[in-house]
From Swiss-Prot:
Biased composition (Polar residues): 486-495, 978-989
Domain of life: Eukaryota
Biased composition (Basic and acidic residues): 472-485, 693-715, 827-848, 882-896
Species of origin: Canis lupus familiaris (Dog)
The record's note on its domains: The RCC1 repeat region mediates interactions with RPGRIP1.
Lipid-linked residues (S-geranylgeranyl cysteine): C1000
Gene name linked to the record: RPGR
Protein's name in the database: X-linked retinitis pigmentosa GTPase regulator
Associated disorder: Defects in RPGR are the cause of X-linked progressive retinal atrophy (XLPRA) in the Siberian husky dog. XLPRA is a naturally occurring X-linked retinopathy closely resembling X-linked retinitis pigmentosa (XLRP) in humans.
Propeptide: 1001-1003
Biased composition range(s): Low complexity: 913-924
UniProt modified residues of type Cysteine methyl ester: C1000
Length: 1003
């Protein structure tokens, strides 16, 4: 389909869809030189093609020898059955695991499975080559062959019907036998014109146009009233079908009937194979398909769970189970269709033949000459706008109406078919992540547009793969998906120069992702409570995974430099946090306070941060920051690819400019922030604390990821965000709240749940990550500002508030780090350091959880007083929340002033004093608060620590003997102190990044 029309011969080609062995799950086509197909038949997993030269070609599964090629090996290419070359093959019929072939001379051959005698050879031994059924002679000319699960049928031109094989459900019309190994005639006293065998039921049409059915009676597939089902083993006429029946087709659990004027269906339609819409899943009463009532149908075909129709104009409609793309609707659409859907790919072709199997479809079509455009417009309009008519209330009058079981995907399909689809998709985005207009995501002003559009663009070619792969596939290929998807997504998003960086980032972040995946178990255990709360804000999709993966490695590294890192985390966090806060305090606060909750839903980190901002908005941010919020909103709202590009570049410039302005603004911001946090209610702080934990998770993951690239981290976070978004959309469609859906999408759940929406995760990650990229950079500045004020506040602000801010800060921190990482961070060192820091943080968080009061003291003993004071400050800060707002305000002011004068020494000293104060308070405060705040604080610190500890605590580093690459941080002590987030990255990062972090921290 993707190749130009000229490549195909004028005689046409055979198109394959679904799992055909010829091209797994990928639409493909083939044709014969100097020959054309005249008959197609699809079995459960194998296919037969008869050509005009009376040759038989077979391919597909062959575990029972059903291809008749003399072996049982799978054949992926159409292969001529040479044994039948002397015979002129006319018809073929493929069952579940056997094949029937008839010749012009009236002979019938069979091959394959024979456990029920379906080969008609008088025994039940399977055959791997075609054997002649002696019952049929040249006296009987075969008109039609049909094969079911384990049944066979042959209809002669004289109207005689012969059936054999399995009769456990009466599917061969014999009353008192379970199976027969030789053909038996089935008659109702009238000549028969058409026969069809389903999996466990059969139907035929008499020359008078009367339909008879027999076999398995469940699900209404026989179309008979209950009183007639007693005799289901014998052919009985089906009432309720007006007009003369021309054809009948039996599927796995449904039956399709073609009359001279309409198409009727009955039976089971849970996949949409009845074509009666999403409100009727089962009916025993034949119902006309209203959607194609204006079309003249010339041929019908049924697979196990899908149906195909050919019109007299050579157009094809398909509906039912869309898995593997067997409906032929394109790579981007492998979803179930509940009403006949026009195969637009065949508008330029005339469909001649179609056959449906268990998991695939074959179509023979010839190029359409002229009139293609007019027909295209005409048919598309009809198919697009007549969908609603098929859902008329008349369909609800009878049958089983299943509203609750209606899947979100189904509802989405319904909406896609109706004119209101776009409005509905706004509130209920598609589950599968099928590309939808950006309009559907309009509710979220964050770079969602870009992510959505790019996502759709990327998803279109790869979506099918996504839907098909199993959950593990996503996990295994997460890194690869992020690399390729992110790089391609960045290209599509017009990130420009950042594209290469993103690619590098993805390469680098593959390891971090794996590690992060390892980390999740520890963090999950520690933060189960937080996660539960986060479910509402579920923006940490990647965080849990990253934590889980890194947890194992972290536990090891944590043991080595646990105390050191903890102290560093606190001290560094204190110092760098204040510095960072100074630079970005305005933007950070503005974004947090200004961003609405809905936005938070759009991005993973954005969700958390935004949620914080919404909650903290009331208490955390005063009106003075509204302008800042607007600015930050504007910055983040730049979701377009260009916006992101410019944002990322601007972020670098802003970071540098922030250095100059940071000092002035940071001082004012710090003061304002101090006032803010003093005024902040504990409730907001608590909420933020838990969220901050989540952010800490994010920051931890970001730390690991930071090594690779800040952009990548931002991308990963957007990933989770997209994931959340798509899942939230799914959840909404399913009736769940977006937060829940987001949570499911967060982590591997989505991937586990669902395969189809699971690759969406990658794509969504790409786009979201890109979207986050901008936010991350914006947030970097914000985060820097927050941390600048936070460092001062760490000692002064209550732990809960601090933790809340830290959580926000950590989110920002992560983004900051990501931005800094974007600059150019040695993946190896930063990775290791970040991992170690994150590991230490997790361990520290655990230690803090168990003994926070003791831990500050122990840490103080182990490390320098500065580190000790810092460490104590975080733990104490949690307890200080309400008690020491005044003290924190004063101390923060002092700390800010001192820090501005001498960031390292003063900050550490101030941290000590504040930590001592906080320690007193923390001892009085409950362990839970301290634990939460410490956890959050530790993780954030770790991110800050990894950078700050390397930076501000340069002296203690040699004493502590930094683990792995931590020593590398020594080189950039100044930079580290200046930019706790960015330093780890800055050590390897270009001077620009150093400037950014420095400008932010130099305050």
């Amino acid at each position: 389909m993707g190749e130009p029309e000229e490549v195909m011969p004028g005689s046409g080609a055979v198109f394959t869809f679904g799992k055909t062995q010829f091209a797994e799950n990928i639409p493909s086509k083939f044709w014969f030189r100097n020959d054309v197909p005249t008959f197609l038949s699809c079995g459960d997993e194998h296919t037969a093609v008869v050509t005009g030269n009376n040759k038989l070609y077979m391919f597909g599964s062959n575990n029972w020898g059903q291809l008749g090629l003399g072996s049982k090996s799978t054949v992926s290419k159409p292969t001529c059955v040479k044994a039948l070359k002397p015979e002129k093959v006319k018809f073929a019929a493929c069952g579940r695991n056997h094949t029937l072939v008839s010749t012009e001379g009236g002979k019938v051959y069979a091959a394959g499975g024979n456990n029920e005698g379906q080969l008609g050879l008088g025994d039940t031994e399977e055959r791997s080559t075609f054997h002649l059924i002696s019952f049929f002679t040249s006296q009987r000319k075969i008109k039609q062959l049909s094969a079911g699960s384990n049944t066979s049928a042959a209809l002669t031109e004289d109207g005689e019907l012969f059936m054999w094989g399995d009769n456990s459900e009466g599917q061969i019309g014999l009353e008192n036998v379970t199976n027969v190994c030789v053909p038996q005639q089935v008659t109702v006293g009238k000549p028969i014109s058409w026969i069809s065998c389903g999996y466990y039921h059969s139907a035929f049409v008499t020359t008078e146009g009367q339909l008879y059915t027999f076999g398995e009676p469940e699900c209404g597939k026989l179309g008979l009233p209950n009183q007639l089902l007693v005799n289901h083993r014998m052919p009985q006429p089906v009432p309720g079908i007006p007009g003369k029946v021309v054809q009948v087709a039996c599927g796995g659990g449904h039956t399709v009937v073609l009359t001279e004027k309409a198409v009727y269906t009955f039976g089971l339609g849970q996949f949409g194979q009845l074509g009666l819409g999403t409100f009727l899943f089962e009916t025993s009463v034949p119902k006309a398909i209203e959607h194609i009532k204006d079309q003249k149908i010339s041929f019908i075909a049924c697979g196990e769970n899908h149906t195909a129709l050919i019109t007299d104009m050579g157009l094809m409609y398909t509906f039912g189970d869309g898995r593997h793309g067997k409906l032929g609707l394109g790579l981007e659409n492998s979803t179930n269709q509940f009403i006949p859907t026009l195969c637009s790919n065949f508008l330029r072709f005339i469909v001649q033949l179609v056959s449906c199997g268990g998991c695939h479809t074959l179509v023979f079509a010839t190029p359409r000459l002229g009139g293609t455009e007019e027909m295209e417009l005409k048919e598309i309009n009809k198919s697009c706008f007549s969908a609603a008519t098929s859902l008329s209330l008349s369909n609800l009058s009878s049958g089983i109406v299943l509203h609750q079981t209606l899947s979100a995907r189904v509802r989405r399909r319904e909406r896609e078919k109706s004119p209101d689809s776009f409005q509905m998709t706004r509130t209920l985005p598609p589950i599968d992540g099928i590309p939808m207009p950006p309009v559907c995501f309009s509710p979220s002003p964050i770079p969602f547009y870009m992510a959505a559009s790019n996502w759709s663009g990327k998803m279109t070619p790869e979506k099918e793969g996504l839907t098909q792969p199993e959950p593990d596939y996503f996990r295994d290929n997460m890194a690869k998906g992020k690399e390729t998807d992110n790089s391609s997504a960045t290209d599509s998003e017009s990130l420009g120069e950042t594209t290469d960086v993103l690619n590098m980032t993805h390469m680098m972040s593959l390891n971090s992702n794996d590690k992060s995946l390892k980390l999740s178990p520890i963090d999950k255990q520690k933060k189960q409570e937080t996660i539960e709360k986060l479910k509402q804000h579920t923006a940490h999709f990647g965080n849990d995974d990253s934590k889980g993966c890194a947890s194992e490695e972290m536990s090891k590294t944590v043991k080595e430099g646990k105390a050191y890192k903890q102290l560093l985390a606190k001290g560094i966090y204190m110092t760098q946090a204040a510095m960072t806060m100074e630079a970005f305090s305005d933007e950070d606060i503005g974004n947090d306070s200004g961003q609405p909750g809905p936005r938070a839903d759009t991005h993973a980190e954005g969700v958390q941060r935004k949620i914080f901002s919404c909650e903290s908005k009331h208490g955390l941010y005063p009106p003075d920051f509204k302008a800042i919020a607007k600015e930050s909103d504007g910055g983040q709202s730049q979701k377009d690819p260009e916006a992101e590009e410019t944002v990322s570049e601007k972020e670098n410039e802003l970071a540098e400019m922030a250095g100059l302005q940071a000092r002035r603004q940071s001082e004012e911001n710090l003061r304002n922030i101090n006032m803010f946090f003093d005024d902040l209610p504990n409730r907001d702080v608590n909420i933020e604390d838990e969220e901050s934990k989540d952010f800490v998770k994010d920051s931890r993951r970001n730390k690991q990821d930071v090594i690779f690239d800040s952009e990548r981290e931002s991308i990963e976070e957007p990933d989770s965000y997209l994931e959340g978004e798509s899942e939230s959309q799914q959840g909404t469609t399913d009736g769940f709240e977006q937060p829940e859906s987001v949570e499911f999408s967060s982590g591997e759940k989505e991937d586990d749940d669902e395969v189809e929406t699971d690759q969406n995760l990658w794509y969504s990650r790409k786009f979201i990550e890109q979207g986050h990229k901008e936010e991350t950079e914006h947030i970097l500045s914000k985060f820097m500002a927050k941390y600048d004020f936070k460092c001062d506040h760490l000692s002064e602000i209550p732990e809960e508030q601090e933790g809340a801010e830290d959580s926000e800060g950590s989110g920002i921190e992560e983004q900051e780090v990501e931005a800094n990482e974007n600059v150019e961070v040695p993946a190896g060192k930063e990775e290791k350091e970040i991992e170690i820091l994150s590991d230490d943080l997790t361990d520290r968080a655990e230690d803090h959880e168990f003994s926070e009061d003791e831990e500050p003291e122990d840490m103080a003993e182990e490390l320098d007083e500065d580190l000790e004071s810092k460490k104590n400050v975080p733990a104490d800060v949690a307890s200080d929340n309400s008690l020491k707002k005044d003290e924190t305000t004063k101390q923060e002011k002092r700390a800010i002033c001192e820090y501005n004068e001498n960031p390292k020494g003063n900050m550490h000293y101030h941290a000590k004093s504040s930590s001592s104060e906080v320690l007193n308070d923390s001892e009085s405060t409950p362990n839970k608060d301290v634990k939460k705040s410490k956890k959050i604080f530790l993780f954030k610190r770790m991110s800050l620590m990894s950078q700050k500890s390397m930076q501000s605590n340069n002296e203690p580093l040699p004493e502590i003997k930094p683990i792995g690459d931590q020593i590398a941080f020594k080189g950039n002590k100044k930079d580290a102190n200046q930019n706790h987030m960015g330093q780890n990255h800055q050590d390897t990062s270009p001077p620009d990044m150093e400037r950014r972090s420095k400008s932010c921290t130099i305050l």
